[in-house]
Swiss-Prot record:
This is Formamidopyrimidine-DNA glycosylase. One of its GO terms (biological process) is base-excision repair. Involved in base excision repair of DNA damaged by oxidation or by mutagenic agents. Acts as a DNA glycosylase that recognizes and removes damaged bases. Has a preference for oxidized purines, such as 7,8-dihydro-8-oxoguanine (8-oxoG). Has AP (apurinic/apyrimidinic) lyase activity and introduces nicks in the DNA strand. Cleaves the DNA backbone by beta-delta elimination to generate a single-strand break at the site of the removed base with both 3'- and 5'-phosphates. Binds 1 zinc ion per subunit. Keywords: DNA damage, DNA repair, DNA-binding, Glycosidase, Hydrolase, Lyase, Metal-binding, Multifunctional enzyme, Zinc, Zinc-finger. The keyword Lyase applies. It catalyses: Hydrolysis of DNA containing ring-opened 7-methylguanine residues, releasing 2,6-diamino-4-hydroxy-5-(N-methyl)formamidopyrimidine; 2'-deoxyribonucleotide-(2'-deoxyribose 5'-phosphate)-2'-deoxyribonucleotide-DNA = a 3'-end 2'-deoxyribonucleotide-(2,3-dehydro-2,3-deoxyribose 5'-phosphate)-DNA + a 5'-end 5'-phospho-2'-deoxyribonucleoside-DNA + H(+). Its cofactor is Zn(2+).
Amino acid sequence: MPELPEVETVRRGLAPAMVGARVARVTLRRPNLRFPFPERFAERLEGTTVLELARRAKYLTAHLDSGESLILHLGMSGRFDVRLPDGSNLSPGDFYLEGALGTPKHDHVVMAFANGATVTYNDARRFGFMDLVATRDLETCRHFASMGVEPLSDALDAPLLARLFARKITPLKAALLDQRLIAGLGNIYVCEALHRSGLHPALPAGALAKPDGSPAPKAKTLVKEIKAVLTEAVAAGGSTLRDYARPDGERGAFQHGFRVYDRVGHACPTKGCTGRVGRIVQGGRSTFFCETCQVLPVR
């Protein structure tokens, strides 16, 4: 599933074609994706102008002049194909699926804009979805009401992290993936941020808060590394694993900078460390970490 940097890359690729443009025609090639389309979906979109294309965690939101916002979630395999009248692609931010996964038979939604651009949503697995809600109700709608803080926002700092994690015995990695606390983090970038911070993924999350609730020293380090990893990944155009590449056909490059993710048996890249990358399973997901410099304290 695409994580925050990939979704942000997609947003940046879609914005030049969509923002300020009027939706001329919407073609639905099936009645549903993961969920059924909203009532009169195409009709409510046609004739509207996109005022802004934003991101909330792993969601995209297109704010329309009708007072509604289009919510887009890419699921596991969703991608957008953006084409200009001359047939060229916009960049950066699209999904690339190997073989038949990216074929036209999986083109489910086609949005034609009055400026001549066409945006096609392709989703082989159909785990993505689209919804329409009143813009004024975005933060309280069912998709966003329980979401936590944005990890790249100024709101996420060491004191807030300490307050969120205080007295929690939940493993640190699981707490970071809890979208009710911090919205937008995923498996790849949590593994990378924990390694950079020298924190074991199974450490109780409450260890980042002192008994009085103030942040432990490592809380500041972790916040800094979360922001650094995400910022670097966005700048690199995301990470290409199996499903992701940029809309100009180039793949995202951050995977070349992975320190631990999917690198079992490789030497730890931390200067002076002689350890190797190991793997454990937490919550049904693979966790990658250095067995030497990310040590779980003995209690």
